[in-house]
């Protein structure tokens, strides 16, 4: 099975796409063969879309099985029509949603400066408990880690206290890793759900092995 791809001829696939248990959002004109790989590997339906007119779909949106979060100015109706799940809009100036929200179907870790109102919208849309925090001191937690319902992989410089908080929030063991030949902001190069994962094309064999282990795909 193919485990690495490019989107728009770049390996930072997590910037341009995002996925849940059932859906993958990709920008228009993503190569058909890439869409097929995502569909087959992740067992999802691929939806081509722009977010606020932008192709950086992964940086600007975050979802789980219950809904999708979008930045201010996005069309909730259009997203709900395309995906078939509810959508919510973050009102804050911090609205590169994929960069600042790390979520699975049970919990979400978010940028520590998000407002109480934003946390309420996240909780209501994704139907999860929401917590503020950092990973390796980084506030853009959505790109500093990847979480599924089976596993959690984060930036190699995560602190002991952050690791303990993450384990408590998500109820999963915390593993460290990289993508794309040493990229520590590993969310930029990885799409994953509880069924499988796809990484950026520059991700090495050892990195793939680490991802596979961390996200629970080794028997």
From Swiss-Prot:
Keyword Ligase: no
Pfam short name (any one): eIF-6
Biological source species: Methanosarcina mazei (strain ATCC BAA-159 / DSM 3647 / Goe1 / Go1 / JCM 11833 / OCM 88)
The protein, known as: Translation initiation factor 6
Keywords: Initiation factor, Protein biosynthesis
Ranges in a coiled coil: none
Molecular function terms from GO: ribosome binding; translation initiation factor activity
GO biological process, one term: cytosolic ribosome assembly
Record keyword Protein biosynthesis present: yes
HAMAP family per UniProt: eIF_6 (MF_00032)
Alphabetical list of SUPFAM superfamilies matching this protein: Pentein
CDD domains, per database record: IF6
Protein family: Belongs to the eIF-6 family.
């Amino acid at each position: 099975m193919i485990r690495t791809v490019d989107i728009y001829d770049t390996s930072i696939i997590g910037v341009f796409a995002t996925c849940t248990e059932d859906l993958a959002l990709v920008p228009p004109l993503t190569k058909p063969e890439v869409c097929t790989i995502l569909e087959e590997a992740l067992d999802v339906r691929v939806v081509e879309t722009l977010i606020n007119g932008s192709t950086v779909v992964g940086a600007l949106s975050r979802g789980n099985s219950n809904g999708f979060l979008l930045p201010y100015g996005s069309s909730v109706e259009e997203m709900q029509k395309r995906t078939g799940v509810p959508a919510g809009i973050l009102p804050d100036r911090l609205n590169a949603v994929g960069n600042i929200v790390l979520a699975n179907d049970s919990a979400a870790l978010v940028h520590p400066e998000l407002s109480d109102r934003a946390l309420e919208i996240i909780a209501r849309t994704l139907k999860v408990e929401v917590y503020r925090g950092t990973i390796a001191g980084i506030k853009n937690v959505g790109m500093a880690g990847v979480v599924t319902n089976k596993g959690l992989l984060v930036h190699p410089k995560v602190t002991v206290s952050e690791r303990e908080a993450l384990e408590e929030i998500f109820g999963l063991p915390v593993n460290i890793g990289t993508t794309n030949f040493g990229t520590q902001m590993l969310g930029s190069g990885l799409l994953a759900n509880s069924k499988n994962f796809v990484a950026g094309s520059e991700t090495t064999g050892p990195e793939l092995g680490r991802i596979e282990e961390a996200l629970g795909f080794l028997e």
